[in-house]
Amino acid sequence: MIALLKPTSEQVGHYDRFLNALVEGGFRGEIARDHGSRTVLATDNSIYQRLPQAAVFPMDSHDVAIVARLAARPEHQQVVLTPRGGGTGTNGQSLTDGVVVDLSRHMNNILEINVEERWVRVQTGVVK
C-alpha cells in the first residue's frame, strides 16, 4: 500500500531540539519547518509520499559538517537525516519522515572541468 500524506502532521520534539541546536551551532543555511515546505519535499519522481519533519539547506560543506557532528551526539540519536539532490529518484530514495538535507539549493556548482582527462569536480547538489 502506498503511504498517503496526512493533512496535518505534528512535529516531534527531538527534531525541534536538533534544529534549534543547528542554529546555536552556527548553521548558516536555511531551515524549513513550515508545512508547505515540508509538503513540497514529501514527493520525488516516484509514486511514494513521506512528510518530513523539516528540511535543511546547507550553504556549504561547513554546514554539512555541523549537521553531521550534531547528528552524532547521543542526544540526537533518534534524528533521521536523508540527503536529497534533485528529487529525481524513482523509488523514493530521498523521502523521509525525518529531516531532509537538501544539497541542491546552494551546493550546486560545477567547480572544475578537465576535458583532456575527461573528469569534472562538482558540489554534491549538482543534478544537471
What are these language model-derived features?
Residues 1-72, 76, 86-118:
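N-terminal flexible segment immediately upstream of the FAD-binding catalytic core
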Residues 78-80:
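Beta-sheet entry/capping signal
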Residues 125:
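Extended, alpha-helix-rich binding/interface surfaces that flank or overlap catalytic cores
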